[in-house]
Design a protein with these regions (language model features):
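Gram-negative outer-membrane beta-barrel transporters
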Residues: 387, 393, 503-505, 509-513, ...
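Outer-membrane beta-barrel signature, preferentially recognizing the C-terminal barrel domain
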Residues: 264-282, 316-325, 372-375, 421-442, ...
Length: 693
């Protein structure tokens, strides 16, 4: 169905630019001033007051892994909950956050693609295999900033992704690469240009036999390699409707199958997205967006004996359907030079439920669980900027209403249908006020000083509210009484740009996340615990709870330099997040949140000229704790990646990519009886590229 829908959209996308060309032929004056760019409204002048890092298309193409999560690692402080990427991680662990603001795997940073929020409607994680990097033209990462303009979820920051610019795309592109462990990566795209519009169609496929996630000293006969297979496709059309209005349509879909390295640990994700956006570029700028997202997720879980000789199935999360719908309207009135005002409203509704089989006896499930609900947020926002001489002032705010409905947790005996749990959770609702104020001043030409203060908020995901889960022998109970997270923060920084090819930025910040949701240790196995059932002797029982707060202070440095074909860039984030806790979580007071390293560093040195390129990227992650009690730590890790591209003819080229060149051990997790998992070992790729038109 996804492929059929993409084909239909491509036909429509092709017809729209053709129709625009026909109109132009009939009336040449109708299109002489039309410039179709496929982007949203212009960026706000007030962004000068924020800590913003941009990643351009050239840098995106040079990722050694070819994956979005690796590209984002160029921005120090932006991290997933775990260090593993989307070839071996459980998808539910792939939430994004910044500045050590976390506590669990849900995203605290808002990822937006062409204006559409991308977090999974049920669980808040990011489906990274859905985003082939050749479809991306620009990434803008805003550290901090609150929820004012972008909406709920933009607590620790925002990642804005724009689709590839047709001016930078060939008519036909194809890439084919073969890598370590029988890995295959293939991608192809086509571009149709017409006066007044364009259309693109692209597809990507990745597979591999995978590596053994469990480190050598922890392995047993039950451990095996973790293969993966992933596919995505997207169709996009942009057409001018008159001289000042653009119609942008997008349709995409993906499938993602992974394994976690033992029997009964396969997981599968599927999704499809559709969106329509109208952009008005006249004196009154405006934007109107509507979107639909559907997701399906399934995952198996296993228990491995102490000798790691046998894996036994413990849970089958056989289906987790989820849907997200929403829209956004924004207006930019003409106020004259130096003034910018945005007024708008947005809405997002998500619904979903997990369907699971558990409590296996003689290899057969004896119980069934269904849990889920619906969440709705809608809000009004305003954002104003004033530029007067060397100073830019910005002030914005929003008010949101939220509502949780249809929350339920039902468990029953499969053989008889007898209910074990029939919890119907009451409807909840509330109002959140957030905003941002900032100033940027350029006292002398190369120097810009900036400061900002902001508030943001995030509604708990349906996954956090209603679904218990397991990781190895450990189990975590849901909590339908969770409150929204609320963040307050201040930033101060300086940007130096003494020349066109050089820049340096430094930012200090203080953030406080009130009501931070974390997985709080509440017991140890063996034993039977509320919300999860039996936990084995090596297992830990945790409950999702609102902590009093997480306070994080830190420093961020970013530098770039380019001279002719040679360039370098570096990014360093140093954070000190600390838990503020009392009551049942008092033992966590003063500790660091799980999976939050003090230091993250990335540095790249490269050369580009005439289609040829070579670069190396060094990354370092400091020691971080596996658990909320800071009793288990993951060792620091330093990796080196390499990339080289050489044109053979005008259309053909060769690529060589190497991930983790020195095969460093990158620890990603510790579970059960000190079983350590690792991220991707050394992986080498050799590929061919085709570019025409």
């Amino acid at each position: 169905m996804i492929v059929r829908a993409i084909a239909l959209l491509l036909c429509g996308a092709s017809a729209l630019p053709a129709a625009a060309q026909d109109r132009a032929a009939a009336d040449p004056s109708a299109t002489q001033d039309i410039v179709v760019i496929g982007r949203g409204l212009p960026t706000r002048p007030g962004d000068r007051t924020a800590d913003v890092v941009a990643i351009d298309a050239a840098r995106i193409r040079e990722s050694a892994s070819g994956r979005l999560e690796t590209v984002l690692a160029d921005v120090a402080g932006l991290q997933q909950f775990r260090r593993s990427d989307s070839r071996s991680a459980n998808p539910t662990s792939q939430g994004l956050s910044l500045r050590g603001i976390g506590g669990n795997a849900s995203s605290r940073a808002l990822l937006i693609l062409d204006g559409v929020p991308q977090a999974d409607p049920f669980g808040g994680w990011v489906p990274f295999p859905a985003y082939a990097t050749d479809r991306i033209g620009l990434i803008r990462v805003t550290r901090g900033g609150g929820s004012g303009y972008f909406g709920p979820g933009a607590l620790a920051g925002t990642i804005e992704i724009d689709s590839a610019d047709p001016a930078d795309q060939p008519t036909l592109a194809a890439d084919l690469a073969y890598g370590s462990r029988r890995s295959l990566s293939a991608a192809a795209s086509g571009l149709l240009r017409r006066d007044g519009g364009f259309a693109t169609l692209s597809a990507a496929y990745d597979r591999g036999d995978g590596f053994v996630p469990t480190v050598a000293e922890s392995r047993g006969p039950a451990d095996r390699a973790a293969p993966f297979e992933q596919f995505s496709a997207a169709a996009r059309s942009v057409v001018a409707l008159g001289g000042q209005t653009e119609l942008q349509t997008n349709l995409s879909g993906f499938t993602d199958t992974r394994d976690r390295g033992t029997a009964f640990t396969r997981n599968r994700s599927q999704g499809a997205d559709a969106s329509v956006r109208l952009i008005g570029r006249g004196d009154w700028g405006w934007s109107a967006l509507a979107y639909l997202q559907t997701r399906a997720f399934a995952s198996q879980f296993a228990s491995v004996d102490a000798a790691r000789t046998t894996a036994t199935q413990t849970l089958d999360q056989y289906n987790t359907p989820a849907t997200g719908t929403g829209g956004r309207i924004e207006v930019k009135p003409p106020l004259g030079e130096g003034r910018d005002l945005r007024l708008g409203a947005d809405v997002r509704r998500v619904s979903g439920q997990t369907q699971e089989l558990y409590t296996y006896v003689n290899a057969l499930p004896t119980r069934r669980r269904v849990a889920g609900g619906t969440a709705l947020t809608y809000g009004l926002f305003t954002d104003a900027s004033l530029t007067a001489g060397p100073a830019t002032l910005t002030l914005g705010g929003r008010v949101d209403r939220w509502r949780l409905t249809d929350g339920a947790l039902r468990e029953a005996v499969i053989a008889t249908g007898a209910p074990l749990t029939n919890a119907i959770f009451p409807e909840r609702r509330g109002t959140e006020w957030t905003g941002r104020a900032g100033i940027a001043v350029t006292p002398v030409a190369p120097v810009t000083l900036r400061a900002s203060a902001y508030r943001g908020w995030r509604l708990p995901t349906l996954n956090e509210l209603y679904r218990p889960f397991r990781v190895g022998a450990d189990a975590v109970a849901a909590n339908a009484a969770l409150e929204p997270e609320r963040l307050s923060g201040i930033d101060g920084g300086v940007t130096l740009a003494p020349g066109a090819g050089i820049s340096f930025a430094a930012t200090v910040f203080w953030n406080r996340l009130d009501g931070a949701i974390a997985n709080v240790t509440a017991g140890r196995g063996p034993g039977t615990f509320a919300g999860v059932g039996f936990v084995a002797a090596n297992g830990i029982y945790r409950v999702r709870r609102n902590l009093d707060a997480i306070c994080s202070t830190g420093l961020e440095l970013d530098a770039r330099w380019q001279s002719g074909p040679v360039f370098t860039q570096a990014s360093w984030s140093h954070v000190d997040p600390r838990v503020v806790a009392s009551g049942a979580a008092a033992a966590l007071d003063g500790l660091r949140p799980a999976q939050t390293p003090r230091d993250l560093t990335s540095a790249t040195l490269g050369w580009r000229k005439g289609g040829a390129a070579i670069s190396t990227t060094l990354r370092h992650a400091a020691r971080q704790f596996e658990d909320d009690q800071n009793s288990r730590s993951l060792a620091p890790a330093t990796t080196l990646d390499g990339y080289a591209a050489l044109p053979l003819t005008r259309t053909l080229g060769v690529e060589l990519r190497a991930e983790n060149v020195f095969d460093a051990r990158v620890e990603t997790g510790i579970s059960g009886n000190a079983i350590v998992e690792r991220a991707t070992p050394r992986t080498v790729w050799v590929g061919l590229t085709l570019r025409t038109g």
